[in-house]
Amino acid sequence: MPPERRRRMKLDRRTGAKPKRKPGMRPDWKAGAGPGGPPQKPAPSSQRKPPARPSAAAAAIAVAAAEEERRLRQRNRLRLEEDKPAVERCLEELVFGDVENDEDALLRRLRGPRVQEHEDSGDSEVENEAKGNFPPQKKPVWVDEEDEDEEMVDMMNNRFRKDMMKNASESKLSKDNLKKRLKEEFQHAMGGVPAWAETTKRKTSSDDESEEDEDDLLQRTGNFISTSTSLPRGILKMKNCQHANAERPTVARISSVQFHPGAQIVMVAGLDNAVSLFQVDGKTNPKIQSIYLERFPIFKACFSANGEEVLATSTHSKVLYVYDMLAGKLIPVHQVRGLKEKIVRSFEVSPDGSFLLINGIAGYLHLLAMKTKELIGSMKINGRVAASTFSSDSKKVYASSGDGEVYVWDVNSRKCLNRFVDEGSLYGLSIATSRNGQYVACGSNCGVVNIYNQDSCLQETNPKPIKAIMNLVTGVTSLTFNPTTEILAIASEKMKEAVRLVHLPSCTVFSNFPVIKNKNISHVHTMDFSPRSGYFALGNEKGKALMYRLHHYSDF
């Protein structure tokens, strides 16, 4: 290269200007392999560089144009909406919903359920694809005739199934018919379909609602399931427990069954001259102690209000036995000063533990001090005293007479506050008051139990019963309210299985008690509920103290 040209190239490089080239000429370093090499062929089309992406300014212009178009559409739609009458706008909102700011939602609704079937339901794409690729269900190649024939079940040779036969032609039943018959028998015994056996269809919510519910569920801690505080009517959930006196069996009639007011203990007494105490566990009920009273068939035994004493009377004696549980001493009360009764049998203890009421002969009621066993005073009614009881506050005494009348006495003044005729009663047999001071129940000789409001018994001369229970046909000899005043137990000792449990305040009878087919209750002479209604016990003439666990109540 000449020296002048080299100098010119150096000057051009320093100044930043490129040397002038003739048109159609290429630099030597691109045209050949080297400065002096032969020219190369142009690169193939596959090696060309991709076209450059649009610049950010162009993208911004496109976004602005789309936004401007959306604004124009929104303005035009609003103008059209202004021209529509209010009725038409309301109708569109009811049909299409509120899609004022969401045109895509309107389009999805107009597409119909066909599009919704293919919408994503929350599953992954793989799961959705797998659901669509299920092979069609294949039909069986052949059908076995023996499989289609219904298998017949013999009803005659099974003693349990024989009772379910309605007539002699049902000596054999198919499995389906037997299943239906068993279902009918169960519902008849339970008084309907239990809540746990009901098959109710629950409505499924949308995905958004379920997610909201899940969020609400996770926002708090604690118990989400709680039992109802009030006892439902219809069916009483209960189960049979071991007999209370299983560890001391007897064949003599049980005259008294009572739960201890403070401990998990039940007392059983009867005509076998013994008072027995058992620990209640529902399984074995181990015996704690038995007190034998010689030649003293027990008519009634009862705990004191504080649970420290047991009082017992006999069928043919005027002696009142008092057993001190703390000291372990048996104290006989042979004679009460001023009391001229030859036989002391029926008595009641006041809820506050202050008084002892003895039902005498010739219509006399004797009030004694519980602590000293001394006579305070006497009250007299017309006719014979059939039954008596204290009010829940221990301030009043209710007495049922043999003439079908009910007397209400004031304990402090020993004056008669009211007197009324028990509706439909020829002569009374039993009476009971609820612990909440709301109800008075009167049982008569014709099997009717009238339930009154206590306020009406105090204020009205002819009160009307809230409800007359007519489920018994013989004289009602036992009445007992449970501590929560939700159950009234009624029974008659004159007929087998004559015991019912009445739901309050509906005054309806629980349909699943007693189970008539079992027939293990027999003649009921006494009943009682545990302090918190967890257990129910009754004594019969066969010497058994039957006990049941009431599942609605969690405590003893």
Curated annotation (Swiss-Prot):
GO terms for molecular function: RNA binding. WD repeats lie at residues 249-288, 293-333, 339-380, 381-419, 421-462, 471-512. SUPFAM superfamilies: WD40 repeat-like. InterPro entries: Utp18, WD40/YVTN_repeat-like_dom_sf, WD40_repeat_CS, WD40_repeat_dom_sf, WD40_rpt. The modification Phosphothreonine is found at residues 204, 221. It comes from the Eukaryota. Signal peptide: none annotated. This is U3 small nucleolar RNA-associated protein 18 homolog. One of its GO terms (biological process) is rRNA processing. It is found in: Nucleus, Nucleolus. GO terms for cellular component: nuclear membrane; nucleolus; nucleoplasm; nucleus; Pwp2p-containing subcomplex of 90S preribosome; small-subunit processome. Residues 207-216 have a biased composition (Acidic residues). The modification Phosphoserine is found at residues 121, 124, 205-206, 210. Residues 43-65 have a biased composition (Low complexity). Belongs to the WD repeat UTP18 family. SMART domains: WD40 (SM00320). It comes from Homo sapiens (Human). Keywords: Isopeptide bond, Nucleus, Phosphoprotein, Repeat, rRNA processing, Ubl conjugation, WD repeat. Residues 1-24 have a biased composition (Basic residues).
